[in-house]
């Protein structure tokens, strides 16, 4: 191991710790990820790993191309969700969730979150559901339980869908899993991770909710009609659901399907303004919505994925994968450990490292396309973030929105989330052992 390899590893470790301690350092993790990426590639370029500028450029462009498929997918998905949200497409959810009993509302919120998270990302789903929950639940003590279950349900719902979580998107784009494979094999473990915590919380909620007001949600703001709202919702959410089908039928990368849905949705909304003034700058026109996309998140993924690519290029991840196989040798334990660690640190770099550690079809049956390790990794990395409230983007956002303390979540939710997590792994093992 030469000096530059040690320097690259040191930069990655320091950067990783800075990202994990973002709440303490108050330095945005996107800035850290980008600097980490540039410094690591700089050491790679000067460390003599490749000969000549042409080989160096080929290495950078090849990895950038692989990373770009995930970034374009995320940007397209974020744009679609933003459009649907601004067109009040999720307003119908509020009507569906109306209930008198606290227990009844718990199950409605839980299942709606679980289902929405399978087609939207868990972060967006959590934000949407928290905003709706606030209109339905007045007592703060109850809201803490509902909000926590939204986190658990969102993470569980995203784990079995190829488009439901950033990590599953990464695995799907990387060719480690297929849409049909991850849905059919991971849905039962995901349900276990969702249903067991829900059943336990069900016993702790008693009584009825205050009657809801009769406020109409038939018409959105900014002059949006109910028809326009419904069209945008069907095209947006229906389009997201159709992306795996598009990928299977055409063989094109998933990001092409996402961009086609985004283009169709953009075109449709422009047609809605056909008879209006061309200079109309309505807040819901796509050109006005694009600046609302979270570019900081996109740059974070760019920095992380390209940094991990450097570690793969210098052979560190392959060596680490071989060491884990020799010392542990059990794909269930490796995936379970990664999931548990993801409750403390960001799961994106963890999954990115695992993808580079185990090349497809070169490390045994568990690591082939739709192999048990990749399916377990999809489940564990997604649901492991529910164990601690800081373990997922959804948890961190809900923590801020509802002012949930780390201590309250740790005492009340961590034990039941851990029980659901372990039950999911056990159910996956039983399904494959039979």
Task: Indicate residue ranges for each PLM-predicted region.
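Interfacial loop-to-helix junctions that mark the boundaries of transmembrane helices
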Residues: 1-4, 24-30, 54-68, 179-188, ...
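Hydrophobic mid-bilayer segments of alpha-helices in multi-pass membrane transport proteins
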Residues: 6-15, 26-51, 67-79, 229-239, ...
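Juxtamembrane and boundary regions of transmembrane helices in multi-pass small-molecule transporters
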Residues: 7, 139-144, 160-161, 170-171, ...
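Alpha-helical transmembrane segments
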Residues: 65-75, 181-197, 250-263, 374-384
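Long, contiguous bundles of hydrophobic transmembrane helices that form the permeation core
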Residues: 194-279
């Amino acid at each position: 191991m030469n000096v530059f390899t040690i320097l690259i590893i040191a930069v990655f470790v320091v950067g990783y710790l800075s990202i994990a301690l973002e709440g303490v350092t108050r330095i945005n993790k996107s800035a850290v990820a980008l600097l980490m990426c540039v410094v690591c590639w700089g050491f790679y370029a000067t460390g003599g790993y490749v000969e000549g500028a042409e080989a160096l450029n080929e290495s950078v462009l090849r990895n950038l191309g692989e990373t770009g498929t995930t970034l374009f997918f995320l940007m397209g998905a974020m744009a679609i969700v933003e459009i649907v949200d601004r067109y009040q497409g999720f307003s119908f959810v509020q009507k569906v969730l109306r209930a008198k009993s606290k227990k009844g509302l718990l199950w409605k919120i839980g299942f709606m979150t679980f289902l929405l998270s399978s087609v939207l990302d868990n972060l967006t789903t959590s934000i949407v559901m928290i905003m709706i929950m606030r209109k339905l639940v007045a007592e703060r003590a109850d809201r803490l339980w509902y909000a926590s279950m939204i986190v658990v349900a969102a993470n569980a719902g995203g784990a079995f869908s190829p488009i439901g979580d950033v990590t599953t998107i990464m695995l799907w784009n990387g060719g480690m899993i297929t849409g049909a494979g991850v849905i059919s094999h991971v849905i039962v473990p995901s349900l276990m991770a969702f249903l067991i915590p829900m059943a336990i919380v069900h016993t702790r909620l008693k009584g009825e909710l205050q009657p809801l007001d009769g406020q109409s949600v038939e018409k959105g703001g900014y002059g949006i009609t109910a028809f326009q709202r419904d069209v945008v919702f069907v095209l947006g959410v229906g389009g997201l659901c159709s992306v795996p089908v598009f990928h299977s039928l055409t063989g094109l990368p998933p990001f092409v399907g996402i961009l086609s849905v985004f283009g169709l949705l953009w075109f449709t909304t422009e047609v809605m303004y056909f008879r209006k003034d061309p200079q109309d700058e309505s807040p819901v026109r796509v050109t006005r919505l694009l600046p609302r996309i979270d570019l900081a998140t996109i740059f974070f993924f760019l920095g992380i994925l390209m940094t991990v690519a450097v570690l793969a290029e210098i052979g560190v991840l392959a060596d680490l994968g071989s060491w884990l196989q020799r010392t542990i040798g059990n794909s269930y334990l490796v995936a379970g450990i990664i999931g548990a660690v993801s409750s403390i640190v960001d799961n994106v770099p963890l999954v990115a490292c695992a993808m580079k550690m185990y090349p497809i079809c070169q490390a045994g049956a568990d690591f082939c396309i739709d192999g048990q390790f990749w399916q377990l990794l999809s489940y564990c990395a997604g649901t492991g973030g529910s164990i601690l409230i800081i373990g997922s983007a959804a948890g961190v956002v809900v923590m801020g929105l509802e002012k949930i303390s780390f201590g309250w979540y740790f005492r009340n939710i961590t034990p039941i989330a851990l029980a659901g997590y372990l039950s999911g792994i056990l159910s996956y093992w039983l399904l494959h052992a039979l």
